[in-house]
Amino acid sequence: MSSSVAERLAIRDAIGNKVELRQNWSEDDLQKVFRAAYEQIFGRQGIYASQKFTSAEALLRNGKISVRQFVEILAKSEFYKECFFYKNSQVRLIELNYKHLLGRAPYDQSEIADHVDIYAARGYDADIDAYIYSSEYENAFGNSIVPYYRGFQSIPGMKTVGFNRICELYRGRGNSDNAQMGRTNSRLRTKVSLNLPNGILPPTSAGTNFVSAAPTLISSATKGDNRMFVIEAIAGGLNTNVAVRRSRQVYTVSYERLSATYQEIHKRGGKIVKISQV
């Protein structure tokens, strides 16, 4: 790819931007790792992150954890959940997890469905582990490299739609994933469910903070994953000191509502007993 094309698509700074914590590192090397990790995992919100992860930084500085484990702490943190988990639809969260943790976009419906299944069966932390402790992560980043955007270059196992899809998700360095046009909606669901490539639209103005001009990709569940799930939960007694008998409740929801219902139950102080597919 020519440098002019990369610049027009606002991906020049992202290509091959690899940060590794090598042996005999200096404090400057460590600070580069911190900055790269915060920007990769949180995007624009990363400017607020350093104050929230001083303990994790100390663990990495003292050799108690690896770069991979540092990334794991960030992705499982309440701050990451506040930025992306609580605010977004299930599919949008999966898109962002692929972007932040593997440096690419999901290629097809099966990759999205796999993470829906993991989340439904084993919860949020297990789903994050499925990215960070995958063979793909191991081969791409190992224990010492901060995840970076690999999808702009040819990578092992890459599908031809990969470049188009990551262009739709990336939208410029340091952008806000939550401030793009489309907000909390999936950017890829329609094209992924129809097995079609995304069009490539350059950001609206090169050299600035970019916002996608692409239309929001919204489709009904019948065009994507139309599975239904049953959530069994024990009702919570949040914000009350009165002893009450907790009732068992059952929710039948589409996979698009799975994440939102999960969050609502926990916010009310409930406990999820089981999630199963209908």
Curated annotation (Swiss-Prot):
Its family? Belongs to the phycobilisome linker protein family.
Primary role: Rod linker protein, associated with phycoerythrocyanin. Linker polypeptides determine the state of aggregation and the location of the disk-shaped phycobiliprotein units within the phycobilisome and modulate their spectroscopic properties in order to mediate a directed and optimal energy transfer.
Q: Name one GO biological process term.
A: photosynthesis
Organism from which the protein derives = Nostoc sp. (strain PCC 7120 / SAG 25.82 / UTEX 2576)
Keyword check for Metal-binding: no
In Swiss-Prot or TrEMBL terms, this protein is called Phycobilisome 34.5 kDa linker polypeptide, phycoerythrocyanin-associated, rod
Record PANTHER family = PHYCOBILIPROTEIN APCE, PHYCOBILISOME 32.1 KDA LINKER POLYPEPTIDE, PHYCOCYANIN-ASSOCIATED, ROD 2-RELATED
The protein's UniProt keywords, in alphabetical order, are: Antenna complex, Membrane, Photosynthesis, Phycobilisome, Thylakoid
List the subcellular locations.
Cellular thylakoid membrane
